[in-house]
Regions:
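Short, surface-exposed recognition loops or helix-turn segments adjacent to catalytic cores
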Residues: 24-32, 270-274
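Short secondary-structure junctions and interdomain/linker hinges
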Residues: 13-24, 61, 72, 83, ...
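Short, flexible coil/linker segments at or flanking structured domains
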Residues: 25, 39-45, 50, 58-64, ...
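C-terminal extensions
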Residues: 29-157, 165-166, 177
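Conserved DEDDh/DEDDy metal-dependent 3′-5′ exonuclease domain
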Residues: 1-19, 157-159, 166-275
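Short, mixed-charge, low-aromatic patches
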Residues: 18-23, 33-36, 136-142, 212-216, ...
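Accessory nucleic-acid engagement/destabilization modules that flank
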Residues: 1-28, 36-40, 46-52
Length: 275
């Protein structure tokens, strides 16, 4: 059953060795992942000022820029042309502005930024009015568990006295995952019922997808989740930032975006795997 797969791998392996040269370093930018060499590959790309340092750029865009003589983040930031062949003019302008903001923000505690959309139904205009009941929540998932396990739920909010609060739910198995899901939905639904101006902020689509997945997995809280979704209680801040701002950071992860509004942390933030 695996003969064709093995033959293909063997062919690729032998072809790699035929072309291998001690004097020719592989280009990290041509790899999809670096495994245990991630830090070293990052150093090479950083030293080369490679175009992959530009936030949200794609491999196809990099190839087209390089074909037109733009081979570094600095060259893109300094580009004098208004467009290049086979690339949308607006996309090129956005990439150039992104590169320029990143170059200008280097060695700065607070990155440069630019508003790029201020009309209805896009960008910052999607932010709803403030409510004292607003909250922010995040989920961490463990993909190596069968069908995944949403093992950590964290929520920040303000209580009735105005003091900052934090709730967390942990799950080490499927039963605890169900309990975390139902407890979270019960709590936020009651909070929203008492204040229909409340919104639940999150960063990226993962949280909403996880709630839908758990609702289907356990067959509970369909009414509550559907009601919250239909009333647009959930607000994706990642979508708002991507549509509304250009930020001089190499990534638009929340760990990078927070450089806009808070001082540099004294400690490292744990990744999902580390947590």
């Amino acid at each position: 059953n695996y003969a064709a797969y093995y033959t293909n791998l063997k062919r690729q392996f032998l072809a790699f060795h035929e072309k291998w040269s001690l004097d020719k370093k592989p280009d990290p930018a041509l790899s999809l992942s670096f495994g245990r060499w991630t830090n070293y590959a990052g150093e090479i790309l950083s030293d080369k000022r490679h175009l992959s340092l530009v936030a949200n750029i794609t491999r196809t865009q990099i190839k087209r820029l390089e074909k037109n003589g733009i081979k570094s983040i600095d060259a893109l930031a300094d580009a004098k042309v208004a467009s290049i062949p086979k690339m949308n003019k607006n996309i090129f302008r956005r990439l150039r502005e992104q590169a320029l903001l990143q170059v200008q923000s280097e060695a700065q505690d607070i990155p440069k930024y630019k508003l790029i959309a201020d009309h209805d139904k896009i960008g910052l205009s999607l932010l709803p009015p403030h409510s004292n009941s607003d909250l922010f929540f995040d989920i961490e998932g463990f993909p190596l568990f069968d069908d995944g396990l949403e093992y950590l739920w964290g929520i920040t909010y303000f209580d009735q006295s105005g003091k900052r609060g934090f709730k967390d739910y942990w799950a080490h198995d499927r039963d605890e995952e169900k309990l975390a899901f139902t407890s979270f939905i019960d709590w936020v639904f009651e909070r929203w019922t008492n204040d229909k101006e409340m919104h639940i902020y999150h960063y990226g689509a993962y949280e909403i997808n996880a709630l839908r997945r758990l609702m289907g997995r356990f067959g509970v809280k369909e009414y509550e989740v559907d009601t919250l979704l239909r009333n647009e209680v959930f607000v994706d801040l990642y979508k708002i930032i991507r549509q509304g701002l250009l930020v001089g950071e190499p990534s638009y992860s929340i760990k990078n975006i927070e450089h806009l509004y808070r001082e540099k942390r004294d400690t490292e933030i744990a990744s999902g795997g580390e947590s």
